[in-house]
């Protein structure tokens, strides 16, 4: 069924088909049809960051930027859904065209530029729904905000969403906002994260609820850089690391007509790089921080590979575009079987 729908959607401009799909999913929620979307399978829950996830497979940020369809997306079987990236003020993002499919590689290039309707709109969307699942909110900075002042944007977003999110992700690794990736390193990273951790702790002290803070990092780093980032995040007291965002590398798609398009490359070409980052993190952190693995998952085996490398949870996005809900089912079944075998010592 999805393959037929995909063949029709892929005849449209990528961004048009994206918006159409979200509109249809949002309509499913409005009409009370989500119960027909499949629902959560019976699986062993996974406890990470102090939260209980129904299963280990989540939807990565970027698909539902404005929390338009998170209820329906959750009803497809995801163990958790991450909305955003959201910024303090709404912004249009980069000029179009800015989204490109590479079907031969099951890949996508995007240079969207954090297009979203702003944090107040996103909060209003979340407040107007009763979502029973685990909901993450991915936060970023506005294009007009300097890198030096970025912490204020992240803090404004965190303080707005923390009453409504199950966890929050600071996106410091999108390649489509100039200078953003420089925040991953050294004192810049510490200065960005420290006020977010302090705000998380203030909220917990005031309301008795800890909302975990994760940080999403890029795949385009050396092993030493990955370790330095990890050390800083541990020192600052974050709750998790999401590895990874899209890559700037085009090595895997050389010769493709979109090879020279600017933006981040996601999908199968980033799989090995993201898995490598997960492995380096896991070996270095030694269970100090949980890792959520994302990048190039297009099968159940790919999802398990991330867990074997050291991730506790996984997220999918591009693979979902190419394979639809069947990938969710396959990844959930495979990761659940993996965890059950670990429990049995098989």
UniProtKB/Swiss-Prot annotation:
CDD domains: DHOD_2_like (cd04738). It comes from the Bacteria. FMN binds at residues 61-65, 85, 138, 171, 216, 244, 267, 296, 317-318. The active site is at 174 (nucleophile). One of its GO terms (molecular function) is dihydroorotate dehydrogenase (quinone) activity. Its cofactor is FMN. It is found in: Cell membrane. It is an enzyme of class 1 (oxidoreductase). Its main location: membrane. InterPro entries: Aldolase_TIM, DHO_dehydrogenase, Dihydroorotate_DH_1_2, Dihydroorotate_DH_2, Dihydroorotate_DH_cat, Dihydroorotate_DH_CS. Pathway: Pyrimidine metabolism; UMP biosynthesis via de novo pathway; orotate from (S)-dihydroorotate (quinone route): step 1/1. PANTHER family: DIHYDROOROTATE DEHYDROGENASE (QUINONE), MITOCHONDRIAL (PTHR48109:SF4), DIHYDROOROTATE DEHYDROGENASE (QUINONE), MITOCHONDRIAL-RELATED (PTHR48109). Catalyzes the conversion of dihydroorotate to orotate with quinone as electron acceptor. Belongs to the dihydroorotate dehydrogenase family. Type 2 subfamily. Monomer. This is Dihydroorotate dehydrogenase (quinone). The gene is pyrD.
């Amino acid at each position: 069924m999805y393959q037929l729908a995909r063949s029709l959607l892929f005849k449209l401009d990528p961004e048009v088909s994206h918006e159409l799909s979200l509109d249809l999913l949002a309509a499913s929620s409005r009409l009370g049809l989500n119960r027909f979307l499949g629902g959560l399978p019976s699986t062993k829950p996974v406890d990470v960051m102090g939260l209980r996830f129904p299963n280990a497979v989540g939807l990565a940020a970027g698909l539902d930027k404005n929390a338009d369809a998170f209820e329906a997306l959750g009803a497809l079987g995801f163990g958790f859904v991450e909305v955003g990236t959201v910024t303090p003020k709404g912004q249009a993002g980069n000029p179009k065209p800015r989204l490109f499919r590479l079907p031969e590689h099951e890949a996508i290039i995007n240079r969207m530029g954090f297009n979203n309707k702003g944090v107040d709109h996103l909060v209003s969307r979340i407040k107007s729904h009763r979502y029973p699942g685990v909901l993450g909110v991915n936060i970023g900075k506005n294009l007009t905000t300097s890198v030096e002042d970025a912490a204020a944007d992240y803090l404004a977003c965190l303080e707005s969403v923390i009453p409504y999110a199950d966890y929050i992700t600071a996106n410091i690794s999108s390649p489509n906002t100039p200078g953003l990736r420089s925040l991953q390193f050294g004192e810049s990273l510490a200065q960005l994260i420290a006020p977010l951790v302090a705000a998380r702790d203030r909220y917990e002290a005031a309301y008795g609820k800890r909302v975990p803070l994760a940080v999403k990092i890029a795949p385009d780093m050396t092993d030493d850089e990955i370790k330095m980032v990890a050390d800083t995040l541990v020192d600052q007291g974050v709750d998790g690391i999401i590895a990874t965002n899209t890559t700037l590398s085009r090595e895997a798609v050389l010769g493709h007509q979109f090879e020279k398009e600017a933006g981040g490359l996601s999908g199968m070409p980033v799989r090995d790089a993201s898995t490598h980052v997960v492995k380096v993190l896991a070996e270095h952190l030694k269970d100090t921080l949980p890792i959520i693995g994302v990048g190039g998952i297009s099968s159940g085996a790919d999802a398990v590979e991330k867990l074997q490398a050291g991730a506790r949870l996984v997220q999918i996005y591009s693979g979902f575009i190419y394979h639809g809900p069947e990938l969710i089912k396959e990844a959930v079944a495979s990761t659940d079987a993996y965890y059950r075998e670990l429990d049995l010592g098989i």
